[in-house]
Amino acid sequence: MSAPLSPSPTVVKLSPECQQYYQDVRIKNKYQGVVYKINKESNQMIIDKTFPNDCNFNELTQCFKENECCIIVFKYVISNSQSKLFFIYWGSETAPQTDKVLYSNAKLTLAITLKGIDIKIAGTKKSELTEEIFKERAIPKQA
């Protein structure tokens, strides 16, 4: 007898404001970034928080919490005239496996929906998402 099929991954819906807040970061420069979370009751991706335009990198790293997952769009400022838009998947290695699966599926949905992302990056440990790593990804190496 074969093993029962595991349930199919849950499809996470995007709340209407997900795209709007993304445009507020990317085009309107209203925020420097936005944190997306999944409301498990409604199974919907929602806005958890926004970053003001003058926030520093340390404020971003405070969102990388143990036992949690989230998705962040963050405008990393390289200089006064240059920035790169990062799509960040945070899935703490200590987060529940069900959350990791849920956010991994949501990551795919968001990545398809949000157009104009410069760089995608993922981490399970804070050491994988340091400012040095962001700089290396944002600034192309000179030949």
Curated annotation (Swiss-Prot):
Where is the major localization of this protein? Answer: nucleus
InterPro entries in the record, alphabetically? Answer: ADF-H, ADF-H/Gelsolin-like_dom_sf, ADF/Cofilin
Q: Where in the cell is it found?
A: Nucleus matrix; Cytoplasm, Cytoskeleton
Domain ADF-H as annotated: residue spans: 10-139
A GO term (biological process) for this protein?
Answer: actin filament severing
Show the PROSITE patterns listed in the entry.
Answer: ADF_H
Q: What's a GO cellular component annotated to this UniProt protein?
A: actin cytoskeleton
Query: Which family would the database say this protein is a member of?
Result: Belongs to the actin-binding proteins ADF family.
Physiological role: Controls reversibly actin polymerization and depolymerization in a pH-sensitive manner. It has the ability to bind G- and F-actin in a 1:1 ratio of cofilin to actin. It is the major component of intranuclear and cytoplasmic actin rods. Cofilin-2 may play a distinct role from that of cofilin-1 in destabilization of the actin cytoskeleton during Dictyostelium development.
Which protein is depicted? Cofilin-2
Quote the gene name from the UniProt entry. Answer: cofC-1
